[in-house]
Amino acid sequence: MILGIDIGNTTSEFGFIYNGKRINSYKLRSDHTKTVDDWLIDISAIFSIEGMKKESVKDCVISSVVPPLEDRIYSACKKFLGKKPLRIGKELKVPIKINYKNPEEVGIDRVVNAFAGVKRYGKPLILVDLGTAITFDVVNQKGEYEGGAIFPGIDSSIEALFSKTAKLPKVSIENVKKVVGKTTVESIQSGIFFGYISLIEGMIKRIIREKGFSPKVILTGGSGEIITKGLEIDHIFDMYLSLEGIYDIYSYHGN
């Protein structure tokens, strides 16, 4: 059993993972005001709620795209568990060839997804992660990371529309059925929901045309649960690819 921690820009997920499968996980806001002691209290509470003894966790493994939070959560885990956590990209390198002009630029979350995607679904792949940003990541027939595209996430777009317009309300995009809205709320919901579906489908078609292969399409991330319902292309939705991918890399290194 490991405690896998996926630190993102908006939320951080703490998950108990056994033999590559998530047992349970908890999402907390990625709060930059929290101290090491605040995170220590949160981690202790997660173990208490789960009824989990810290002795049952062999290692803590962290994947992070937020360095300041990574440092605090690392210190909190070290205090709580009495051992140093392992960090993806530092103690645990991601074993995948990166064909970016500057491989150091690629977010660790993207290469974790790429490695986990290949291990679980084969190759080639297009991975679409719907989080604070939407990332499109391409893995070629050799299992190499080719690159991709980045777009503002759904929640980011909703927040921008709400904050920069005087009369448009903030909306939820669950259960959107019709493209043509009959109210302002319905029109915004349609624009966001079907607009992003069209974006994703269009980008996937363009990537396939440009790269010249037929990949599996893997959808993941917080907003994926909503978007998967409307996509009209073959795809697999894997909510916990990023979290379970932490275990895949940990396991690869002989743990």
From Swiss-Prot:
Pathway: Cofactor biosynthesis; coenzyme A biosynthesis; CoA from (R)-pantothenate: step 1/5. Its cofactor is NH4(+); K(+). GO terms for molecular function: ATP binding; metal ion binding; pantothenate kinase activity. Pfam families: Pan_kinase. CDD domains: ASKHA_NBD_PanK-III. It is an enzyme of class 2 (transferase). It comes from the Bacteria. InterPro entries: ATPase_NBD, Type_III_PanK. It is found in: Cytoplasm. The active site is at D109. A monovalent cation. Ammonium or potassium. It catalyses: (R)-pantothenate + ATP = (R)-4'-phosphopantothenate + ADP + H(+). GO terms for cellular component: cytoplasm. Gene3D superfamilies: 3.30.420.40. Substrate binds at Y100, G107, I108, D109, R110, T184. One of its GO terms (biological process) is coenzyme A biosynthetic process. K(+) binds at D129. Belongs to the type III pantothenate kinase family. Catalyzes the phosphorylation of pantothenate (Pan), the first step in CoA biosynthesis. NCBIfam families: baf, PRK13318.1-6, PRK13321.1. Homodimer. This is Type III pantothenate kinase. The gene is coaX.
